[in-house]
Amino acid sequence: MSNKMWGGRFSERPDEIMEEINVSIDVDRHLYAQDIAASKAHAAMLATQGIITASDAKNIGKGLDTILSEIGKGGFTFKRALEDIHMNVESRLSELIGPAAGRLHTARSRNDQVATDFRLYVRDVIDETDAALAAFQQALVARALEHAGTVMPGFTHLQTAQPVTFGHHLLAYVEMAARDRGRFQDARKRLNESPLGAAALAGTSFPIDRHATAKALLFDRPMANSLDAVSDRDFVLETLSAASICAVHMSRFAEEIVIWTSPLVGLIRLSDKFTTGSSIMPQKRNPDAAELVRAKTGRVIGALNGLLIVMKGLPLAYQKDMQEDKQGAMEGFAALSLAIRAMTGMVRDLAPDEAKMKAAAGEGYATATDLADWLVRTLKMPFREAHHVTGRIVAKAAEGGVALHELPLKEMQAIEPRITKDVLGVLSVESSVKSRTSFGGTAPKNVASQAKSWAKRLEKERKLG
């Protein structure tokens, strides 16, 4: 027997392999809440337009509420023979209310139905991700305020470059998360149009009101072209793109945590809450949470690439290939959610070794730029000349195995006679960070001000909901 939902044209049942490759309920069951919400909006609109009776619409709504409760409580049996979430819900609705259930699919196709469901799902993902990123920012800002003046090495090429503060470093990720949130919100704006009512691809001859269903589902408007409505997956791609960039940020931070917690570096320590041990080496404390964030974020990027490859060769309109749009995306979104929450936990948990940070900040002649700047300001030396002179002084200090501030003044003067003892005032890591007062710089006052500004902004967002 062929599938009773679409089998009027068929006289043979599908091959077992056909059933196996065609089924999607294992994945799209996660759309049940969105599917039921869209069906309720559709049924109400059909009744308002006089396409079905108010009595049928009422019974459909009650039946759908029952199904929603059954699934939520784990009492619903999903049947693989019914292929997908749409047919599973409709079949159960038929059991509950009888023939009236068959009227629900009037002026609707599974093509616009799944497009609507998935838009609602991705919209929910965006809202949840925004909330998670806000919590991540709040954790970063709190630690940045705490460590606005904690000196640490700033790096380029993973080499000590210039002293910065730990708070300044943390605020860099606040800015990244802000851009991530902006990208998700931009994607949400373009996503928030309703495909419902586009039917299979050409619209419908029934006098439906697509604006009413769009409003009921909190979309801004219905999509203007029925072909585009059922074949578009830009909303998933764009959200996965934003998710991938966000994942890169999480991975970069996770990598830093892995490096900083290494005993060879030892700038920070994670508590037992975010580390694991070894089955053979009793002494080990491994930063597995950070390492797993680094790995899981790759799944987000993989989901984006996978869907791009699925979509790149599809003519209009709906193709069955699009059934493969959900699993990778859902797994990618879940991986990002876990990564953000794990990073938030680690930010709250990590303990910087302030003494070690300060000592490391001065290694590698990190205040050499401060010396060059002093030569420019005090001796009116062109920067390129100052750069050259400083390089010679650094070489002299390295030759003697001493730090810049330990190099005798007379040896500096042997290279540049006009240097005075005042230069020693700019060669400490504390004076270096305090001098970086330009907007966006690492001076502790700047960092504290920026952190307070972010704290106010995030609190305002929280109150506005």
UniProtKB/Swiss-Prot annotation:
EC class (word): lyase
Superkingdom of the organism of origin: Bacteria
SUPFAM superfamilies: L-aspartase-like
Primary residence: cytoplasm
Pathway: Amino-acid biosynthesis; L-arginine biosynthesis; L-arginine from L-ornithine and carbamoyl phosphate: step 3/3
A GO CC term assigned to this protein in UniProt: cytosol
Keyword list, A-Z: Amino-acid biosynthesis, Arginine biosynthesis, Cytoplasm, Lyase
Keyword Lyase listed: yes
EC number of this enzyme: 4.3.2.1
UniProt-listed GO biological process terms: arginine biosynthetic process via ornithine; L-arginine biosynthetic process
Locations listed in the record: Cytoplasm
GO molecular function: argininosuccinate lyase activity
Catalytic activity: 2-(N(omega)-L-arginino)succinate = fumarate + L-arginine
InterPro entries: Arg_succ_lyase_C, Argininosuccinate_lyase, Fumarase/histidase_N, Fumarate_lyase_CS, Fumarate_lyase_fam, Fumarate_lyase_N, L-Aspartase-like
Protein family: Belongs to the lyase 1 family. Argininosuccinate lyase subfamily.
HAMAP family (alphabetical): Arg_succ_lyase
PANTHER family cross-referenced by the UniProt entry: ARGININOSUCCINATE LYASE (PTHR43814:SF1)
Protein name, as recorded: Argininosuccinate lyase
Lineage of the organism: Bacteria, Pseudomonadati, Pseudomonadota, Alphaproteobacteria, Hyphomicrobiales
Gene coding for it: argH
